[in-house]
Every structure is written in structure tokens, then in C-alpha cells.
Amino acid sequence: VRSYAAWLGTEDSEQAYKDLREIYQAFMWQDPSRQGKKWVLKTPGHLMALDTAMKVFQDAKIVMTHRDPVSTVPSYCSMESTLYRMGSEDITHVMVGEYWFERLSQWTDSFMSVRSKSPEERFVDVKYTELLKDPVVQGQLVLEAAGIDVTPDVIEDMGEWIEANKREDRAPHKYDISDFGLSEDMIKEKFAVYRQN
């Protein structure tokens, strides 16, 4: 719902992040084996309030996987369109494209703004092309940046997981950028500053 998203974007999310931190603390309290372990929060939604998330989770490392928006925007729109259509037949691909094109642009701009004002050591950058070339090395770099000891067993476990979860073994994600009312040129123009970095 666009009006809800617009409202949410104006609200202070600090209490929500404090509540989230408390939930994780409760999880660790309930299961002593989790104590002292790192948490991984994976969602691009954190980009809309990254400054707040970093304030509440003061020792968090932000891992940013950089991929060309020409690929990610239509892919994300396709995923969202699939999710939306589960709940409504009135939602069109073009409606999803219009909404998420703007939202992803806002998130990216927000990320770049927060990044420019934050200590460099809070961030770990991973180029998607490098991740595809050598996922174990990239995983090792991320873990080391997060202060996690990378033992030979960890490297072996990563390699085994990657071997068991090959991208080629999954069905391809098929979509056409024009289905969402978008074009490569539109994306290149909207994300020009991000794509230059």
C-alpha cells in the first residue's frame, strides 16, 4: 500500500530497531548456544533506515553486495510481483515496477548518504561479479571483517555448501524488464551516481 509505505518512510524507526534488538537478546537468553554468536540480518529493507539500524546495533558490520541495478531492479520487481499477485489479482506488473523502481532508488540514495557520513570500518563491500568468481574468498573476507575466525573447517564448510547449492541447479528466473514498464535506459539514468561508484 503506497500510502502506508509513504507514512512509514516519515516515521522514526529507532524504537522498532530497539525492539528488534531486544527480541534477539531474548533469543540468546532462551538458547545459551547462541550467546556470543553473530547474527546475520539479510534484507534490503534495512537500507531505508540504515542510519538508525547502525545506531541501535552499534557493532554491526554492514555487508553490501554491489550488483548492477540494470539486473537487480527488474529481478526485484519480478519477485515482488509474484508476492503481490498471491494476494491480489488487481496488481499489475507495471504497478509493481513503478512502485519498486522509485523505492529501490530511494533505498540506494539513502544507503549512499549514510555511507558517506559513516566510518569506513562499518562496511564490507562485495562486488557481485567477484562473489560469482570466488564465493569462498568473498565469504572469508566478510567473515574476517566481522571478526569471525576463519578456520580451515569454516572454509571447507563454505565450499561444501556452495557445491550443494549451485546456482546452475536452480530453475532460471525469467522475466522481461518491459513487463514492469521499465527500460535499461531508465534504470541507468535513475541509478547513475550509484553505478559510477
Locate each region found by the language model.
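PAPS-dependent sulfotransferases, especially Golgi type II membrane carbohydrate sulfotransferases
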Residues: 1-18, 24, 28-31, 76-197
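Flexible loop/turn segments at secondary-structure boundaries
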Residues: 15, 46-51, 70-73, 132-135
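Flexible, glycine/threonine-enriched loop-and-boundary segments that flank and lead into catalytic domains
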Residues: 23, 29, 33-59, 114
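Conserved phosphate-donor/acceptor-positioning beta-strand/loop module used by diverse small-molecule
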Residues: 42-43, 53-78
